[in-house]
Regions:
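Juxtamembrane regions of bacterial inner-membrane/periplasmic proteins
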Residues: 2-154
Length: 154
């Protein structure tokens, strides 16, 4: 009987640990959002109608989520891929928004900027992201940051 109890406790421990690991990205995302003071608002449409800084196609845009973001760190192929333009623009918007808030420690900065980037890709259209990034001087920074050897990597 005691062996069965020990085995049962071990299984419960394994299930609780697995559930904790599975929930961790979502919990960190929610914590990061809780640390953000206010939400950025998308810009109005660019007068020219051309919002992107590059000619990269914006078709097939997939909003980010906490689990796919965390999973990319364990996938060598994902780490080698070029970061989609929409994700770079969303990160730029999140970073600029957080710069306007009181400064905090580095861990809080990274957690809140990542969570806000994910939130922006989930709640704004690709056009809203591009227009807002352009308004936030992303195009000027983007042209300076492009490496002569090729596009930025993850």
């Amino acid at each position: 009987v005691s062996t069965m109890r020990a085995a049962g406790k071990a299984w419960v421990s394994v299930v609780v640990l697995a559930a904790g690991i599975a929930l961790l990205p979502g919990l960190l995302y929610l914590l990061g959002l809780a640390l953000v003071g206010g939400w950025p608002q998308p810009a109005d449409r660019a007068p020219s109608g051309v919002a992107a800084c590059s000619s990269e196609p914006r078709t097939g845009f997939q909003p980010m989520n906490p689990w796919s973001f965390a999973a990319q760190f364990f996938d060598d192929d994902a780490m080698k891929k070029k970061v989609p333009e929409v994700e770079r623009e969303a990160f730029w918007i999140a970073r600029r928004h957080l710069w306007r808030q009181p400064r905090h420690d580095m861990l809080r900065w990274h957690l809140s900027s990542t969570a806000l980037t994910i939130w922006i890709t989930r709640n704004w259209s690709a056009a809203q992201i591009a227009d807002t990034a352009r308004k936030e001087d992303f195009c000027r920074a983007w042209s300076k940051r492009r490496a002569p050897g090729g596009p930025m990597k993850r």
